A protein has these predicted regions:
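A short secondary-structure junction signal
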Residues: 79-83, 105, 112-115
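Gly/Pro-rich active-site loop or hairpin
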Residues: 40-44, 50, 111-166
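Conserved, mostly hydrophobic/aromatic
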Residues: 23, 104, 134
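Active-site acidic/histidine proton-transfer and metal-coordination neighborhood
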Residues: 3-101
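Active-site beta-loop-alpha junctions enriched in small/polar residues
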Residues: 1, 27-28, 73-75, 106-110, ...
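Proteins with a high burden of low-complexity, intrinsically disordered sequence enriched in S/T/G/P/A and R
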Residues: 1, 6, 151-155
Length: 166
């Protein structure tokens, strides 16, 4: 769309001006029908969504003339029609789109607690050669679930998962 061309053109100009080591964005969606929902919403972990994301990432990388890094987002819900888990989705996306990963260890920790999986399994499944950067952060603990807020100290569990990553 025209809006996409304007925003991506502005990004390309900014990259030319500041020359960052890399550019990143979250693996998520944030709106529908031109309405911004002001949150990072999880991608359905389906082959159709994966194909869509690969095409979009390749289009952006082709336009920018460089690889981008994609960051895993914290998730709070899953889709009933998911046909793969999140780490399979992220790994396949990185490989098929030939992009970097920005691994947010806190986001893995939050998602693991919220969905009841082992975060180490997520980390171990990622193509380590594609990890360009690692983020650590804090979150809010609401007992039954965690929310990624970046406004609390990093907890020991996130540090443990980070040590496992290294």
């Amino acid at each position: 769309t025209l809006g996409w061309a304007k925003s991506i053109g502005g990004l390309k100009a900014l990259i030319a001006r500041v020359q960052p080591g890399w550019v990143s964005d979250h693996i998520c969606w944030t709106g529908v029908d031109h309405a911004n929902l002001h949150d990072l919403l999880p991608m359905p972990c389906t082959e159709a969504a994966l194909k869509h994301m690969v095409e979009r990432v390749q289009r952006v990388q082709d336009f920018l003339g460089q690889r981008i890094a994609l960051e895993n987002a914290s998730t709070y819900v899953a889709f009933a029609n998911d046909d793969m888990n999140e780490w399979e989705f992220v790994s396949e996306l990185a490989e098929r789109a030939d992009c970097w990963l920005l691994l947010d260890v806190n986001n893995v920790y939050v998602s693991a607690r919220n969905h009841g999986f082992d975060g180490r399994r997520y980390i171990d499944a990622l193509p380590s050669g594609r990890i360009r950067q690692i983020h650590l952060a804090g979150h809010e603990d609401h007992g039954d679930y965690l929310i990624d807020t970046h406004d609390h100290p990093i907890c020991p569990g996130v540090y443990d998962l980070y040590a496992h990553t290294l």
